[in-house]
Amino acid sequence: LVGFIGAVAVINRFLGLFNLNLEHIFGYLFAPFGFLLGLDGKEVLLEGTLLGNKLILNEFIAFGELSTHLGELDARAGMICAISLCGFANLSSMGMCIGSIGVLCPEKRSVISRLVFRAMIGGVFVSILSALLVSIVFLF
């Protein structure tokens, strides 16, 4: 985790030369998910940024970022953002899964390594679908 955070800091330092950072890039890459969840305006970019932070770093850092923005969001948007961040699907958890399951079954480590990325993507979509259900329920 410390390595990922350090790598992100180095990349942000480099992108700072172009007046960019990874959070803004993630905000625009993952903004369509925020739009599909029924968020609007500034909330869409915030949701994209949070999803990107969750995927690249981890959910705790994304929740910390969300806590700084809760005053700006209405209750529905806050619930949608919080539910979309619940889950264990991020890059650091891929390594944990390979390491922990690989110890239990060392001869299948190559299969686990091949499938863990698909499992992470599935976990991201499950979190987004859970947030979509919250979005639908709280429309009324």
How does the language model describe each region?
Residues K54-F140:
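C-terminal transmembrane helix pair
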Residues L1-L70:
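Transmembrane helical segments that form the transport core of multi-pass membrane transport proteins
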